[in-house]
Amino acid sequence: ILYHWRVHENSTAASSGSKTYTVQSGKKALEAHLSRMNIKGKVYEAEFAPNFFKIEYDLFKTPLVSIVIANKDHKEDLKRCLDSLKKSSYKNYEIIIVENNSSDNEIFEYYSEITKDGNIRVVNWRETGFNYSSINNLGVRESKGEYIILLNNDTEVINDNWIEELLSIAQFDNVGIVGAKLYYPDDTIQHAGVVIGMLGI
């Protein structure tokens, strides 16, 4: 297939600024689609480029969300993670920390401190070695929430509405799992999702 891209000074192919009405037209088209599908949400123009849009879906309900965090030692990492969670605008959540073979007394003292908060529990994975799947499965079994978030202990939440963002997609019947964009400390992207359905995966 030979494809030619025609660039004209009065065309959006050269610059979106030449036809600014296309932004509003795109926004209205998405709003009309939501209305036809009987889905409640707001359409916003993306900040990074013109004629790109973000849909913020309304939550159907506010279910309990269980946040499972596997942890071994590393008090400072865990503390940073938990401190960032406190900034979350979504409040109906519980935290299950799966302790796996820590040897530093400092972390156990920290556990005693944080479990005074009613929505934080520590459960013990008592097997030897390291099995990340088994550790997380224990946390899931101990969870009471309708939705589960698997979170690394060295993660720091940077957007206070992060739980709402995940829920707004996960709540649809045709969605089984939702991933988040992760950044390194220097703001480069560490992870931006996994594509499934290719090569039989």
Predicted regions and their residues:
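A conserved acidic beta->alpha catalytic loop
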Residues: 99-110
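Short aromatic/hydrophobic "clamp" motif used to bind/position activated sugar donors
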Residues: 148
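Catalytic core of nucleotide-sugar-dependent glycosyltransferases
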Residues: 16-41
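Glycine-rich, basic loop-to-helix element that forms the pyrophosphate-binding segment
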Residues: 125-143
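Conserved donor NDP-sugar-binding/catalytic core segment of glycosyltransferases
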Residues: 156-200
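Short beta-strand/loop segment that forms part of the nucleotide-sugar
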Residues: 92-101, 123-125
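Cell-envelope/extracellular polymer assembly enzymes that use nucleotide-activated donors
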Residues: 63-68, 94
